[in-house]
Amino acid sequence: MALRNLRYDGDEILRKKSKEITVIDDRILTLLDDMIDTMYENDGIGLAAPQVGILKRAVVIDVEDGNIYKMINPRILSTSDEEQTAQEGCLSVRETKGMVSRPIKVTAEYTDVEGNLITIEAEGLLARAICHEIDHLNGVLFTDKIIKSTK
């Protein structure tokens, strides 16, 4: 496993839509492991492949102290009508934090590293992280959704 270089706001790759992963091979597994190392090294709770310069639909998330989600081709199936506004930051936008409104609950679907299709019901911080990271896969940064800047 190795650290990958982060891409920062202003890098055009962060504004491009990522491609579906069709084969889960050693390159994808290594990418996910490297993303986890890079996320931890930078004190993050989530990281999407475009943030390390790879336009593939891959995300890693750890909001629960070591309960790591490795998500391939994640997508949101449904969201709660109720939203919560909370502060967000981003490893690719280091100097900015802001209040962003997100659904309190989401139902998401993704493929795990063994090729199994997983459906997850998430709420709170995990739901927020899933939405934030999937936004990255679609070329959207949290700064596009800020209601009020806090830093």
Question: Model-derived features: where do they sit?
Answer:
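Positively charged
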Residues: 1-151
